[in-house]
From Swiss-Prot:
Transit peptide, start-end: 1-29
GO cellular-component term (any): mitochondrion
Region (Disordered): 1-20
Domain of life: Eukaryota
Residues spanning the membrane: none
Subcellular location: Plastid, Chloroplast
PTM-bearing positions, type Phosphoserine: 97, 474
Coiled-coil parts of chain: 387-489
Miscellaneous: Assisted protein folding requires ATP hydrolysis, but not K(+) ions.
Name of the protein described by the UniProt record: Chaperonin 60 subunit beta 3, chloroplastic
Length: 597
């Protein structure tokens, strides 16, 4: 016997053909199917598979050597891209043309080594690149090279009998102290220096640097700058109305681009609700209108419960409706204010019961219009269609009045953020190239440059070209005096030696001896003096525009140190034993007789 409870709502039957009908997917089923099966039968159908493991101990140093071999293979591969004279890496693509990239983290993600222990070593260092990329958006190659240096120097002293626990503690304390020194060396970035920061990150490409600086000048430092693939061979820049906030899609099933993991719609309608949506029936009429009109729909509400969310997801996956949903940004009163800002930008009406609007009774007249919406896991960008310019101006004036009346600095800061999001608009850089392969490589460079510029705005800038890390090495001796244990001091020395690795590799990629370059740089007491690998000159790097964002250098140092500590504390590696590939069955595969002759 079987019993089934279902709550199913069918909508749009008179508005769309059967294949486009919208259905609410809410059902609970219980069945006696399978109850008669014995436990033995189930075990036979679903056998457990136990994979044997291989243990690699470090008694003779072989485990660490193999891990380090994996680290070196990845770092040597990624390292060729470092600096203004770094080379490209060609990545095989299963589908389409090969990819030619100069981006460290993109190269690192492609590396899978045949030896499982070496592969674990490569994966450890890849974490430094990925974490730096997530937080700073640039400096991934430097993170890998710095981690390689810390591991190389650390393995030497651990092999000589030093205590890895105390060594790693010394590395940790030294890194923390160096980050504090780095912040002292940092200075706030001027508008005229933004182009230099972007250009250095893009491989000394001042066309890209100037374009990013121009974009920030147009939308402000707190404005939003996005990248698109252009249709011509030239780069271009344009600015449109729009706002971005830190709220992504509620469910990954709303994604329309599985490669970028984002939901993107053009000429989209917006439905703004200042309450929780608890019942699918409340939004039936709005969804039916979207099916009938054939337009994408973005729902922004305080929250969406399981039943209405399941309705949206199922019908989106069936192709019945183009829809996405997210929770409204902010909390409490600020949430309502953000919804009003979005309404001003899009011309929507916010659904609130206190003003007499009931969710189940509203029609398409309350929907707003957006030229484009892009939702990722963490952010949403809404670009207006340009029809609400006057309303936006009035809204900005209202917020400015609130700033004058505000007493707390925190409140003023939040109000200024709202103005930037409303009036700053979205600057769109279209990256152009002659071929698709060149376009992808170029877009990665521009993306790095944009991320570096944003990082510079956040935490300031320092001298670039690997010279800041080299200068930090001179601070280590003073830091050692604060460490009580001798082996912790050895950990500090490991950091000191590793800090020269990035500059030496930049010089090597430029065809110069890295050790000679390091000595010449340190021979000058001027902290801004360094080696310009692009020109081969020793000069004032700050004046020459060779600048790095402080945030990028900090993330490189912290994440490389974290990975090195994990590596040096490892003493055993456990990997799966690869099963031999089973031989092909005997007999003619085209023979249907049932006999294997």
């Amino acid at each position: 016997m079987a019993s089934t409870f279902s709550a199913t709502s069918s909508m749009g039957s008179s508005l769309a053909p059967p294949s486009n009908r919208l259905s609410s997917f809410v059902s609970i089923s219980s069945s006696s199917f399978g109850r008669t099966q014995s436990i033995a039968q189930r075990k036979a159908r679903f056998p457990k598979i136990y994979a044997a493991k291989q243990l690699h101990f470090n008694k003779d140093g072989t485990a660490i050597k193999k891990l380090q071999a994996g680290v070196n293979k990845l770092a040597d591969l990624v390292g060729v891209t470092l600096g203004p004279k770094g080379r490209n890496v060609v990545l095989e693509s299963k589908y389409g043309s090969p990819r030619i990239v100069n981006d460290g983290v993109t190269v690192a993600r492609e590396v899978e080594l045949e030896d499982p222990v070496e592969n674990i070593g490569a994966k450890l260092v890849r974490q430094a690149a990925s974490k730096t990329n997530d937080l700073a958006g640039d400096g991934t190659t430097t993170s890998v090279v710095l981690a390689q240096g810390l591991i190389a120097e650390g393995v030497k002293v651990v092999a000589a009998g030093a205590n890895p626990v105390l060594i790693t503690r010394g590395i940790e304390k030294t890194t923390k102290a160096l980050v504090a020194e780095l912040k002292k060396m940092s200075k706030e970035v001027e508008d005229s220096e933004l182009a230099d920061v972007a250009a250095v990150s893009a491989g000394n490409n001042y066309e890209v640097g100037n374009m990013i600086a121009e974009a920030m000048a147009k939308v402000g430092r707190k404005g939003v700058v996005t990248l698109e693939e252009g249709k011509s061979a030239e780069n271009s820049l344009y600015v449109v109305e729009g706002m971005q906030f830190d709220r992504g899609y509620i469910s990954p099933y709303f994604v329309t681009d599985s490669e970028k993991m984002c939901a993107e719609y053009e000429n989209c309608k917006l439905f703004l609700v200042d309450k929780k949506i608890t019942n699918a029936r409340d939004i039936i009429s709005i969804l039916e209108d979207a099916i009938k009109g054939g337009y994408p729909l973005l729902i922004i509400a305080e929250d969406i419960e399981q039943e209405p969310l399941a309705t949206l997801v199922v019908n989106k996956l069936r192709g019945t409706i183009k829809v996405a949903a997210l929770k409204a940004p902010g909390f409490g009163e600020r949430k309502s204010q953000y919804l009003d800002d979005i309404a001003a930008l899009t011309g929507a009406t916010v659904i609130r019961e206190e003003v007499g609007l009931q969710l189940e009774k509203v029609g398409p007249e309350v929907l707003g219009n957006a030229g484009k919406v892009v939702l990722t896991k963490d952010t949403t960008t809404i670009v207006g269609d340009g029809s609400t310019e006057e309303v936006v101006k009035k809204r900005v004036e209202q917020i400015k009045n609130l700033i004058e009346a505000a007493e707390q600095d925190y409140e003023k800061e939040k109000l200024n953020e709202r103005i930037a999001k409303l009036s700053g608009g979205v600057a769109v850089i279209q990256v152009g190239a002659q071929t698709e392969t060149e376009l992808k490589e170029k877009k990665l460079r521009v993306e790095d440059a944009l991320n570096a510029t944003k990082a510079a705005v956040e935490e300031g800038i320092v001298v670039g070209g690997g010279c800041t890390l080299l200068r930090l090495a001179s601070k280590v001796d003073a830091i050692k005096e604060t460490l009580a244990n001798d082996e912790e001091k050895v950990g500090a020395d490991i950091v000191k030696k590793a800090l020269s690795y990035p500059l030496k590799l930049i010089a090597k990629n430029a065809g110069v001896n890295g050790s000679v370059v390091s000595e010449k740089v340190l021979s000058s007491d001027n902290p801004k003096h360094g080696y310009n690998a692009a020109t081969g000159k020793y000069e004032d790097l700050m004046a020459a525009g060779i600048i790095d964002p402080t945030k990028v250098v900090r993330c490189c140092l912290e994440h490389a140190s974290s990975v090195a500590k994990t590596f040096l504390m490892s003493d055993c590696v456990v990997v799966e034993i690869k099963e031999p590939e089973s031989a092909a069955p005997a007999g003619n595969p085209m023979d249907n007789s049932g006999y294997g002759f």
